[in-house]
Amino acid sequence: MKIYKVDKTLVSTNRIAMMEHKPLLVVREKDGGTPQVAVDPVGCKPGDWVICCGSSAARDATGVKGYPSDLTIVGIIDKWEVPQDADTTS
């Protein structure tokens, strides 16, 4: 599992049927980091710090075996101090 920050929502209305209508979010490991798409089954909003899992754990976390995801949000962090030496510039 890794910690990410939610950057913004991602709108994709035309999807394969298996993806259903689960929300998709753009997340980054740090400000200015590479954007990644994560499935959001927990209800996050931009600016939230979240815990994500990847690989087969990401598929299992959606609740649908074989779901086409390699990054899924599994929790919203209530309180977390960003380390002082972390690059948080945008």
UniProtKB/Swiss-Prot annotation:
Record gene name: csoS4A
Organism superkingdom: Bacteria
Organism placement in taxonomy: Bacteria, Pseudomonadati, Pseudomonadota, Gammaproteobacteria, Thiotrichales
Cellular-component GO terms for this entry: carboxysome
Domain BMV positions: 1-78
Protein name: Carboxysome shell vertex protein CsoS4A
tRNA processing among keywords: no
One Gene Ontology biological process: carbon fixation
Xref: CDD domains: EutN_CcmL
InterPro entries, per database record: CsoS4A, EutN_CcmL, EutN_CcmL_sf
Alphabetically ordered keywords of this record: Bacterial microcompartment, Carbon dioxide fixation, Carboxysome
Protein function: Probably forms vertices in the carboxysome, a polyhedral inclusion where RuBisCO (ribulose bisphosphate carboxylase, cbbL-cbbS) is sequestered. Has been modeled to induce curvature upon insertion into an otherwise flat hexagonal layer of major carboxysome subunits.
Species of origin: Hydrogenovibrio crunogenus (strain DSM 25203 / XCL-2) (Thiomicrospira crunogena)
Subcellular location: Carboxysome
Assembly description: Homopentamer.
Description of its domains: The tight homopentamer forms a pore with an opening of about 3.5 Angstroms in diameter which is positively charged.
Family: Belongs to the CcmL/EutN family. CsoS4 subfamily.
A Pfam family reported for this protein in Swiss-Prot or TrEMBL: EutN_CcmL
Record's note on what induces expression: Induced by growth in low levels of dissolved inorganic carbon (at protein level).
Coiled coil: none
Classification via NCBIfam families: carboxysome_A
